[in-house]
């Protein structure tokens, strides 16, 4: 029987839930996600969790009591979506700050033993650091002792550099210890692009091939393919001839500045129109991982933008994980997620900390 009941706020497609769902001591009772398609994707992967597909502002105390009945929530996980901090105006800043206050409101109502609040690294410097100070002060004001740390998913077996702020609060004494890296110098080698997606068939712009080209020849692939006979969503985005020419001209790790002048795009940042490295982990992926004009996302072997399945792999979603909606929505679900392997590392340490309270 599970010892700890969990609620996931701003759940997205369930990347953070994933790690807790894999430990029998945790029982995820409910999740909240405002976007309909994303909530459907969550429910397809976590069918036993009550999904509350609504604005968090609508989660009243009465509604929560109705859903949870007499069950106590021991742990709340999640973090408001916070992309593009540098472009936020004052009104948007206020809206984002309101989401943190809603998180605090739910904590106040349910009074869990602990919470895990995750967010992008930019939150530390947003508004010259004052927003993060305010968030910490608000959580401390309702009796939580806090610890926070910047974790890079690449250090936990994810084939991608992806930094996330992990803020952990406990009522009273906080015995949470952050997971030690498992990959890096002196540890297991980082999982590279080749390790992570090299078994998926070569496809060109606009092509589909939902099969495996090789055996699962490393630990990461064995994990990704454990419950799957054939992959899905391995479709290359269709691009025009000029972009295909650009992608085919670039070598491993090169960007638009390395292109001949006659085909070099005149606009775009330095990491746009850029190939990833085959023998290194990926840079941070976003919802734009199929759009070379917006991010570094060109496949180093196949000279094309990434397929949805490849994006999911770079986030460490196993091949049986289901995404829902349009292709753009699926990329949003993947690009905004907490990598499952990172969530597993956090969940194990959270279990230890909760057990130490008993």
What are these regions (language model features)?
Residues 216-358:
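C-terminal target-recognition/interaction regions appended to catalytic cores
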Residues 1-4, 356-358:
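Short, Lys/Arg-enriched, disordered terminal segments
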Residues 31, 51-53, 146-150, 284:
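Conserved beta-strand scaffold positions in the cores of enzyme catalytic domains, especially
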Residues 62-70, 83-265:
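Class I S-adenosyl-L-methionine
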Residues 79, 114, 305-308:
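Short aromatic/basic micro-patch
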Residues 2-111, 121-125, 130-133:
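Core alpha/beta nucleotide-donor-binding catalytic domains of modification enzymes
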């Amino acid at each position: 029987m599970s010892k700890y009941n969990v609620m996931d706020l701003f759940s997205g497609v369930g990347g953070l839930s994933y790690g807790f769902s894999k430990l029998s001591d945790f029982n995820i009772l409910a999740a909240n996600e405002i976007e309909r398609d994303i909530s459907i994707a969550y429910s397809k992967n976590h069918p036993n969790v009550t999904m509350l597909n609504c604005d968090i502002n609508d989660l009243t105390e009465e509604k929560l009591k109705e859903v949870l009945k007499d069950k106590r929530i021991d742990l709340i996980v999640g973090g408001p979506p916070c992309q593009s901090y540098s472009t936020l105006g004052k009104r948007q800043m206020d809206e984002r700050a309101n989401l943190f206050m809603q998180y605090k409101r739910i904590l106040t109502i349910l009074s869990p033993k602990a919470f895990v609040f995750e967010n992008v690294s930019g939150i530390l410097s947003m508004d010259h650091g004052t927003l993060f100070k305010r968030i910490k002060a608000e959580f401390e004001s309702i009796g939580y002792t806090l610890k926070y740390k910047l974790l890079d998913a690449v250090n936990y077996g994810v084939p991608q550099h992806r930094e996330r702020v992990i803020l952990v609060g406990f009522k009273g004494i906080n015995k949470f210890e952050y997971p030690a890296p498992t990959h890096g110098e002196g540890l297991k080698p980082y999982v590279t692009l080749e390790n992570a997606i090299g078994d998926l068939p070569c496809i060109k712009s606009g092509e589909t091939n939902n099969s495996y080209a090789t055996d699962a020849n490393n630990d990461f692939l064995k994990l990704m393919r454990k419950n799957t006979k054939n992959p899905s969503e391995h479709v290359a985005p269709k691009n025009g001839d000029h972009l295909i020419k650009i992608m085919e001209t670039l070598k491993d790790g090169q960007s638009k500045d390395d292109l001949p002048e006659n085909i070099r795009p005149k606009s775009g940042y330095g990491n746009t129109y850029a190939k990833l490295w085959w023998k290194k982990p990926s840079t941070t992926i976003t919802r734009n991982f199929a759009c070379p004009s917006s991010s570094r996302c060109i496949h180093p072997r196949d000279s094309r933008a990434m397929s949805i399945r490849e994006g999911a792999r770079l986030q460490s979603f196993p091949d049986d994980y289901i995404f829902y909606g349009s292709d753009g929505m699926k990329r949003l679900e993947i690009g905004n997620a907490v990598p499952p392997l990172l969530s597993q590392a956090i969940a194990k340490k959270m279990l230890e900390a909760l057990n130490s309270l008993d």
